[in-house]
Amino acid sequence: MGNPNGFYVLKFNDAELIPEFIPFPSSADGTNRLRIMLDPPMALSELNGIHRGTLQAGTKLVVNLFDGGIRDSVRASIDGGEEILLNYRVRIDPFIKNLYEKFAKTDDAYPTPDRSSHIWELMMPDNLAAGLHHIVVKSTDEFGQYQRATFTFELESNLATNF
């Protein structure tokens, strides 16, 4: 679980086969092949704000590399710093878990989330200063295919440093 609807393009080079997953543009992630989020989500300062607020203690950067697996690698750079290799984990995708909780007991309820085998995590630094922060995530799959995505958020303060 954790892949949006999509299809595969199969590339052949003599006897070599390279599959490439393409998400349908109608999904929540459009045609992105990576979903980047914070878990737990930021404590938002405004109900209609997007990625502006405070980090909670133990916040992780979580990346879902759609159709990824243990033979792939995911790296992240925070604010132009050195690239850090993320840890591969089999776990429930927090994005799907949030949708499940949001729509529970409604006509649009989601099925109970299952663990995803294409999740990578990185513990967020607990010393990030207030202000804008930019994360660049890069992945390389087992076939050498490369993906790049970004995530920007604004810290008004950092609750993680208050513990």
Locations of the language-model features?
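Short, intrinsically disordered/low-complexity patches at protein termini
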Residues: 42-44, 97, 108, 158-159
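Flexible, low-complexity linkers/stalks enriched in Thr/Pro that connect modular domains
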Residues: 152-163
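Short, surface-exposed, polar/charged, turn-prone segments marking secondary-structure boundaries
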Residues: 38-39, 91-92, 103-105, 163
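Aromatic sugar-binding surface patches on proteins
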Residues: 93-123
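Short, solvent-exposed beta-strand-terminating loops
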Residues: 84-90
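Binuclear metal-dependent phosphoesterase catalytic core
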Residues: 1-68, 72-75, 123-129, 134-154
